[in-house]
Amino acid sequence: MTVMEHTKAATLDLTKHGLHNVKEVVRNPSYELLFEEETRADLTGYERGVVTELGAVAVDTGIFTGRSPKDKYIVKDATTEEHMWWTSDTVKNDNKPITQEVWNDLKELVTNQLSGKRLFVVDGYCGANPDTRLSIRVITEVAWQAHFVKNMFIRPTEEELATFEPDFVVMNGAKCTNPKWEEQGLNSENFTVFNLTERTQLIGGTWYGGEMKKGMFAMMNYFLPLKDIASMHCSANMGKDGDVAVFFGLSGTGKTTLSTDPKRALIGDDEHGWDDDGVFNFEGGCYAKTIKLSKEAEPDIYNAIRRDALLENVTVRSDGSIDFDDGSKTENTRVSYPIYHIENIVKPVSKGGHANKVIFLSADAFGVLPPVSKLTPEQTKYHFLSGFTAKLAGTERGITEPTPTFSACFGAAFLTLHPTKYAEVLVKRMEAAGAEAYLVNTGWNGTGKRISIQDTRGIIDAILDGSIEDAPTKHIPIFNLEVPTSLPGVDPSILDPRDTYVDPLQWESKAKDLAERFINNFDKYTDNAEGKALVAAGPQLD
């Protein structure tokens, strides 16, 4: 076996991962080598990348243009039995159990697929704090998948590579599928499976890059909270004085837009931990949505799409130009790039001190929630567990009505412990740091229009500069929220949502409807004492 590597690290023995007769190992290749490898003329199908006019390579991930949660399984054994938040008949989630026997079959499939091949091995870190990071090894036969991993995880130095030992191994066998899935009781021939005793993830059948990124996020979500370290689906930034803010929010709530602020340096845009030293990024890159991307609206992301960035599922015209408006393949078009493609970032390491502001973003299409309210510690836990947002969905009659989404901890798909554990650890960290929490509605109000980005930015500025603390407040019934009555640079007529309705009774009836949905959703957390104690912090109906 020859080893070709960008580093001078020792020859790798892949037999310990069950791989045999490997022809060649390309370890931690340079971006130049990856560019050559992923655009080779002899590549076919989903392996081949095309060069765009912006310099970035674009790839097609096939039928999988997003994660496949129905194909996610975790081995149920002595390691995971007690702590894992397993799916159940009463509360469904994505943590479905499989046996060691099924795992053994799937591992044989993937190792057979990768054995005897020329392989790319990318070693990196998940977590910017050396004390708590996971050392990740990803093994794949596909060059662009190695490129994705190099972009998204933290890139080690030559010295670190020389002594690198993986804590977790990801074997990506995207080209193989599982012929025995039906008799094994699985969802399909494709699979994304985890074994926490072996500390290994196996991927088969899906080419979507995000399975590797979010797979490791799910693992950080398992290991860190058990050490009392918060693991968070959020963006984070830092002010000139070192003050740190974190922004939680589901897709479409403004998490990336609002944390990308010319006045503040970006720590990271998606996954963070919070330990005794402060807030730290898990990643070494960003994975941004590109649908309808324009240079004018989002210059930072647009300018990050250059050589070494990797585009997924965008429409590339024959002249190499990109049609970012075309969602015919998927609305989930993406780009991964190393974080240093963004100019205003925290350097040299993506971490900051303790957060003093925690912001929950909800886009409320019901038009009920106030644009901003300050939360008590109990309300913080309640709204964190609720993870609410709502979209306007068209019905067959052409009427648009709101569709609520409740996603625990603003990231239910990636949770591996019971949601109350994340709430408990977050609030513990907040209380130790004296941090305040705010619920910010970036959605709609009684005017039928979305709250303007200018008003929302004014609200965020007032939270971050502390001026919201000096504002007079009033109480909003049903949701039991305290809201400011005036803020600098914000239209005062929107701060009490009732004032945006011609008839205040209309707000009340909508508020009762939404409150009932909150209450029904929260029922599932009342299966333990921690959850029961929080019911009083949520909306109340007489």
Swiss-Prot record:
GO terms for molecular function: ATP binding; metal ion binding; phosphoenolpyruvate carboxykinase (ATP) activity. Its EC number is 4.1.1.49. ATP binds at residues 214, 233, 249-257, 298, 334, 450-451, 456. Substrate binds at R67, Y208, K214, R334. GO terms for biological process: gluconeogenesis. Mn(2+) binds at K214, H233, D270. Transmembrane segments: none annotated. SUPFAM superfamilies: PEP carboxykinase N-terminal domain (SSF68923), PEP carboxykinase-like (SSF53795). It comes from the Bacteria. GO terms for cellular component: cytosol. Belongs to the phosphoenolpyruvate carboxykinase (ATP) family. Monomer. Involved in the gluconeogenesis. Catalyzes the conversion of oxaloacetate (OAA) to phosphoenolpyruvate (PEP) through direct phosphoryl transfer between the nucleoside triphosphate and OAA. This is Phosphoenolpyruvate carboxykinase (ATP). It comes from Vibrio parahaemolyticus serotype O3:K6 (strain RIMD 2210633). The gene is pckA.
